[in-house]
C-alpha cells in the first residue's frame, strides 16, 4: 500500500513538474499557445521565421523546414546556414504532411499568419503547439491576412517586427540574441531620416519592384516602406493592394525611374532587359534596373537585415551624394559576422 501511494505521489509530482515546465505565449494571431519549457525540436514552415531563427543562432533546435525554403530565401542562402540542406521538409506555407511531421516528433511548429485554419487545426489536433508569425501588428480583422489593410503601415511593421523577433527568441530561449537583433534592425533609421528628411514627396524617386510574372507589391506591405525610408516612392502603391500580378501596360503607365529586382529572382533582370516592351520605360533608358543584394529583402514582410542594411543600400543607390561617407561594406560585413557568423559575399547584385 505504501509502495502504491509512493508511486502515485511520484507520478503526480512529475505531472506537476511538467505542468510547471510548460510556458504560455501569445502568438501574432493573438492565440494563447502552450509550449514546452525548452525547445529541442522545432519545425519552421515559414521562411521569414527561418531567417530570423538562423540569425538568432537557433538552427541546432530545428529539425524540419518548409519545402521551398531555397526559392523563398534565395539559392545562396544555404551558404549562411548549410545545416538546412539536409533537414526534413514536412510542409510549406499553406499545407503540411501530418505523417511526416509526426515522424519528426516536434516540440513546436512555426507557421505563417495566413496559414489555412485547417492546417493549424490539423497540427493542433495531434497535440503539437502551433505558433503563427506575421511580423506586423494592426487591426484584429487583418491579422490573418496575406494582404492586409493597415491604418498605420509604418507602425504596424515596426512594432510587428520587434514583437515577432522577441517572440521567436522567447520560444528558442535566445532573449539576448533577440534583443541585439532588434537593436541592430532599427539602428540606421535615424541616419536615413537625417539625410533624407528634406526630400519632398514630389521629389522622391519613382520606383517599381519587379517580381516574376509581373508580380509586384502595392500598399499594405513592407516593400513600400523600405522605399519610403530610402527616399523612394512605390509607383504601385496608389492603385494596388498587397501582392498582385499587374500588366506591362500598368508598368508603362507608371513609368518608374528605377526598377528593383530581389536577389532571389535574378532571372527577372535579363527578362526585363531583353524584352522590347520595357524599352521605353525611364528606368531602362537610364540603365537603372538593379538586382538587389541578398540583405536588401524588399519583401512583403520585414526582415531585420532589410531594415538595418537594405534601406541604407537603397538610399545610397538613389542618393549617392548624400551617403558618400557611409561605409556600407563595413556595415554589412559587421552585421553578417554578428548575426550570420560569417562574412558577406556579394553575388551579382548592384552595390
UniProtKB/Swiss-Prot annotation:
Keywords: Ion transport, Molybdenum, Periplasm, Signal, Transport. Its main location: periplasm. The MolBCA complex shows a decrease in affinity in the presence of increasing concentrations of substrate and nucleotide. It is found in: Periplasm. GO terms for cellular component: periplasmic space. GO terms for biological process: cellular response to iron ion; monoatomic ion transport. It comes from Haemophilus influenzae (strain ATCC 51907 / DSM 11121 / KW20 / Rd). InterPro entries: ABC_Transporter_SBP (IPR050902), ABC_transptr_periplasmic_BD (IPR002491). Residues 1-21 form the signal peptide. The lineage of its organism: Bacteria, Pseudomonadati, Pseudomonadota, Gammaproteobacteria, Pasteurellales. Belongs to the bacterial solute-binding protein 8 family. It comes from the Bacteria. Part of the ABC transporter complex MolBCA involved in molybdate import. Functions as a low-affinity molybdate transporter. Binds to both molybdate and tungstate, but not to sulfate or phosphate. The complex is composed of two ATP-binding proteins (MolC), two transmembrane proteins (MolB) and a solute-binding protein (MolA). This is Molybdate-binding protein MolA. It holds the Pfam family Peripla_BP_2. Molybdate binds at residues 47-48, 217, 264, 300-301. Nucleotide binding is coupled to a conformational shift at the periplasmic gate. This shift is akin to unlocking a swinging door: allowing just enough space for molybdate to slip into the cell. The lower cytoplasmic gate, identified as gate I, remains open throughout the MolBC-A mechanism, and cytoplasmic gate II closes in the presence of nucleotide. Residues 41-322 form the Fe/B12 periplasmic-binding domain. SUPFAM superfamilies: Helical backbone' metal receptor (SSF53807). PANTHER family: MOLYBDATE-BINDING PROTEIN MOLA, VITAMIN B12-BINDING PROTEIN.
